[in-house]
């Protein structure tokens, strides 16, 4: 009870193939693979963009003002 044997998964796979057909499943697999590939490329380019951009504190021409807040009256 609670755990599925290999035969349960085989039956589920057969039912899914009968309902959707192999062509539809292949198209879904291609779409899913393309989405994963696009996501990985996006993450890779995001990492490269972050490495090329200097942090805000290290940008040239900026200045830091050290002050304390004034009391409101």
From Swiss-Prot:
The chain crosses the membrane at residues 1-21. It comes from the Bacteria. InterPro entries: TatA/B/E, TatA/E. Keywords: Cell inner membrane, Cell membrane, Membrane, Protein transport, Translocation, Transmembrane, Transmembrane helix, Transport. One of its GO terms (molecular function) is protein transmembrane transporter activity. Residues 43-73 are annotated as: Disordered. It is found in: Cell inner membrane. Pfam families: TatA_B_E. Belongs to the TatA/E family. The Tat system comprises two distinct complexes: a TatABC complex, containing multiple copies of TatA, TatB and TatC subunits, and a separate TatA complex, containing only TatA subunits. Substrates initially bind to the TatABC complex, which probably triggers association of the separate TatA complex to form the active translocon. Part of the twin-arginine translocation (Tat) system that transports large folded proteins containing a characteristic twin-arginine motif in their signal peptide across membranes. TatA could form the protein-conducting channel of the Tat system. This is Sec-independent protein translocase protein TatA. It comes from Laribacter hongkongensis (strain HLHK9). The lineage of its organism: Bacteria, Pseudomonadati, Pseudomonadota, Betaproteobacteria, Neisseriales.
């Amino acid at each position: 009870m609670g755990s599925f044997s290999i035969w349960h998964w085989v039956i589920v796979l057969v039912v899914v193939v009968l309902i959707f057909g192999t062509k539809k499943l292949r198209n879904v697999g291609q779409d899913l693979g393309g989405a994963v590939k696009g996501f990985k490329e996006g993450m890779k380019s995001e990492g490269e963009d972050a490495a090329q951009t200097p942090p805000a504190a290290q940008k040239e021409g900026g200045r830091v003002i050290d002050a304390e807040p004034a009391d409101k009256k």
